[in-house]
Design a protein with these regions (language model features):
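P-loop/Walker A NTP-binding region and its immediately flanking N-terminal helices
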Residues: 2-189
Length: 189
């Protein structure tokens, strides 16, 4: 898809840019429509789902998780549902209600306490330092969740910048590292 100032004047058609942007938005929305939003929609990951649901029900969870597996198995979806369950005002049976403002904000990608970070694109030390700094800003709700997608893409200096936050996290902070290459995650994590 074309975007930016170059698309505005393609073949002298200023509306082309608007049509392409509308199509891109429609594809993004379609993608999110079919992404699972609650535990019952996750298929083939019953063991992981049961463990995370039980932790939410007991209100006793770890501060860091590595969700590893091939592309398309649901790592990021599981992390998002877990984040929704941890931040949901009306969570029941270890899962998010899907209706409160917190749940809706997660689905739209605009939750104030759930930060999704693409490590494949933002893999450097400066970005990691900013994540670590923001980790100590308290949450507005019961938990703050960092979902690090493609975590294997982080550089060694970036992991070093996150290490102190991982070793001594604030009590409200949960990390979910999603990766297709768990061997690339440092052993110290």
């Amino acid at each position: 898809l074309l975007s930016g100032p170059y698309a505005v004047t393609i073949n002298g058609h200023p509306a082309l840019h608007q049509r392409l942007e509308a199509r891109k938005e429609a594809l993004t929305i379609l993608y999110n429509v079919y992404r699972p939003h609650n535990w019952t929609e996750i298929v083939g990951q019953e063991a992981v789902v049961n463990i995370l649901k039980a932790q939410v029900q007991r209100k006793s969870w770890g501060h860091a998780y590595i969700l590893a597996g091939p592309s398309g198995v649901g790592k990021t979806s599981i992390a998002r549902i877990f984040a929704a369950a941890l931040t949901c005002a009306k969570a029941r049976a270890g899962g998010p209600c899907g209706k409160c403002g917190s749940c809706k904000a997660i689905v739209s990608g605009a939750h104030w306490d759930v930060i999704e970070y693409d490590a494949a694109s933002n893999r450097g030390i400066d970005e990691a330092r900013e994540l670590a700094r923001r980790a100590f800003l308290g949450p507005m709700g019961p938990a703050k969740v960092y979902i690090i997608d493609e975590a294997h893409g982080l550089t060694s200096p970036a992991w070093d910048a996150l290490l102190k936050t991982l070793e001594e996290p604030p009590p409200y902070l949960v990390w979910a590292f999603c990766t297709t290459n768990p061997a690339a995650i440092p052993a110290t994590v």
